[in-house]
Amino acid sequence: MIRNTLAFLAILFLLIPTALLIIGSVSVPSTRMTLAKVEGTEFGIFGTCTGNGTDCTETSFGYNASSSLIDDFYYKGDKRLVLSKVLITHIISAFLSFLSAIFVFFSIFLVNQAVNIINIIVVFITTLLTCLAFAIELVLFLPHNTWQSYVTAGAIGSDLIAILALCLRSVSISRIGQKSARLEHVDTMNSSYSSYKTDVKYPLALDDKLSSVPTLPKFHDALTSTSEFGPPSDSGDTVGTTQYPGDIKYATGYESTVASPVPSRVAKLSSRDTPSIIADYDEFRKSESSPSRSSVLSTSKPEVHETEGYCPHKTGNRPGFPSLNIPRTRPTTAGIANTQFDLEPYRNRQAGSISSEGTDSRFFDVENQVSVAQTPSVKPEMFPKTARPFAAIHANASSTQLRNTENITHPGIPNHFAKTTSSVFDEPPATRMPQTRSPVNDHSSFPSDLPIKGEMSTNMTGAPRVGSRNNSSNDLHAQAGMLKNVGNGPRNAPRNNSSNNLHAQGGMPMNMRGPRGAPRNNSSGDLHIQSGMPMNGRNGPRDTSRNNSSSDLYAQSGMHPNMNNGHRGAPRNNSSNDLHAHGGMPVNMRGPRNTSRNNSSSEFNAQIPMNLRNGPRNASRSNSSTDLFGQSGIPGNSRGMPTSPNSRNNSALDLSMHGIPLANNSRQFKRPSYGNMSRPSFELNGSRNPSHGSLNTAHAGMGYGPRSMMRDPQNLSNVPPVSNTLDQLSGNADFELPVRGNRNNRRGPGGNRMIR
């Protein structure tokens, strides 16, 4: 539809310039219409007229005007006669416009891209001629031209619109051409399929189309053919023929046999290429047997032999693999000493070790059997003392005998971990295993109080094996905070050595460096690096003095983000004052409230968000050093609980951590914030684990308790007594804890839960 509309528009805009050009061409001397008029002289395309049209020249192509009249025009050159002859282009343009309209009209009925392109070319030429005629009029008659000369400009515009319409029609024709081409292709495919069904008769009859078909070649012949190209031989291959990567054949001294992957029935034809004639439908209906066994079917009847069916549980009957040669009787005890293992499975055996199918099967032994060959004599160098027959011993010895025998090893591998016991087999002494001592089971070379490898994976209490001081020091470094590393025993038993080794194993999962020196001060100086710091192992002490290590301790212990906080001064009081702000505090880096030692020690425990064990028992240096190494880095040890609320050094320093406010501490405890690197082991009351939330609420005090306890920090009635809290935590009392969440560990409305 759109193509026809565009065609009619093109015809319309081609007829308009035809009419305009005809109007411009009909002028004096034929009519009274003029292109220009100067001093009573009228100019047209074919001549001039004077005296109001009474005196006119003859009609001709080109004319000369008088010299007096030429001076009134812009162009006064000698070429005016030539240009006047070119005015004939008006008539030519009008004719081409009308001819183009006729072509476009006929193209409506003939939808062809080539015809449309020809129309575009003709209209374009017409437009060029019209432009030329309008230009000559302007050159000859300016400034005295009349309105009749400007109608040519309208013809030019109309021709351009016609060209645009024809271009749009060309695009539409190209699209319909592509669509018709696709439809034609589909029609061609459909017609081809229809003609095929017409030519072929359905249903196909065996006697019409498939009266005889060649059979497929034997599979094993195709694999073991002697020629790489061309048909293989009819007869079976023999030993010495060329083998290819796909062959399944093994030279064993006898005639080679090939295991065919065909599982049950194999048809052997007299000739591979002999066609086997298939019966037609009528013969198949009349016969009582299958067509392959009918007497009227084949010229050479195939010989069919039955083979054993494929059984995966039977060793050796796997498709594509030969049968196995395995002695079904186990070797006796008397023949074990004179047994030699065949350690070369790819070496050719003797002719006697052939299976019933004639195939060597050493490489395809899939059962847990041992194929042994009896030899008349065994040389001593061929049978090492430690090479005992592993499978044979297990085959003949009972479970009681195996528990009392030596450890059985693989051939050629000496056993250094075998027990020293007697053998139940009557064999010469030369063939017995060497008696060795096991470093795992022999405890004579180590102290009896030392933790043994393999027994320390679940002991995380840090309790010593024996009550001696050295032994507890030896055991403590291995059990405090070590989840996986259980093999790092002390270098030796002295007390200094355990202190030197303590910094490497206590609470350090990854950094296992040794001490910098043997003195106790050096181990104390290094202790701040490794205790409780999994990844940071570079902040050594400034010097070996005890004061300096205490000054640096607050900056390096447990601080992941802030690793550059040096001590503010060398005095002991200053390091104690700053210790509470930096030791074990990932986010809260507040300074001390005053310079007194008691205040800084008291607030040290209160400003550690979740670490309830790193606080010193009292303000003395020795006690803090004693408690610090045991409690830092132990995940589940909350031994920092106060023992008595009346003791100044012990309870007063620790009570701020457990909810007992101090007299000189008027600042309200705040809810702690956590950084990305130090996440506590359990959250607050909104914990996902209700037991952790309950325990936290029970002994956390005002810093972690309910909102009612945090409203008035000075009101001691809101704080549970320490003795009751200790009784509840030790299991001597029943209490209810506000726990947020239900039994499925989901966040929800809080409630009380009885805990015994």
Swiss-Prot record:
GO cellular component: cell division site; cell tip; growing cell tip; non-growing cell tip; old growing cell tip; plasma membrane
Feature: compositional bias, Low complexity: 289-300, 485-520
Transmembrane regions listed in the UniProt entry: 91-111, 120-140, 148-168
Region (Disordered): 281-328, 427-453, 482-650, 686-713, 735-756
Domain of life: Eukaryota
Residues annotated with Phosphoserine modification: S438
Residues the record marks as carrying a glycan: 52, 64, 190, 396, 407, 459, 470-471, 496-497, 521-522, 547-548, 573-574, 594, 598-599, 618, 623, 649, 664, 676, 685, 715
Comp. bias regions, Polar residues: 433-447, 593-605, 617-629, 640-650, 686-697
UniProt KW keywords: Cell cycle, Cell division, Cell membrane, Glycoprotein, Membrane, Phosphoprotein, Signal, Transmembrane, Transmembrane helix
Signal peptide extent: 1-24
PANTHER family: PROTEIN DCV1-RELATED
Protein name as it appears in the record: Membrane-anchored protein 1
Species of origin: Schizosaccharomyces pombe (strain 972 / ATCC 24843) (Fission yeast)
